[in-house]
């Protein structure tokens, strides 16, 4: 009877109504941006630079360089958010090694983390999907949903 209370309220602002990319293209752009996040010059031209969440955070009239900085910060934040849930800390470690500090082959990074390469690849895929979901919630104007996806630490009184 009161189930309408649990439905999300749509934003009145038209800026949130239509994402600049459909979900599949958004996911492809996130995967590409994650691969390039440690090399900002390679983020030039990434479709996420025109995504609503980047434009809102960068502000009106932001340069491409400013939008790149915002995108990098959001990718780094999403990776950090993974570590807030104990069951995803392995995903965070893998994402950090693959995307933020890619200094050697994935095989070597898996070895350094003490996990089989197949597990490393599986964790990397899961982390990438989670990060995509987190950013998608921001893109469609559901920042509260992004916080629910990340389940941030809560203080205990």
Q: Where are these predicted regions, by residue range?
A:
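Short amphipathic alpha helix immediately N-terminal
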Residues: 83-105
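N-terminal interaction/assembly modules
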Residues: 1-86, 106-107, 114-119, 123-126, ...
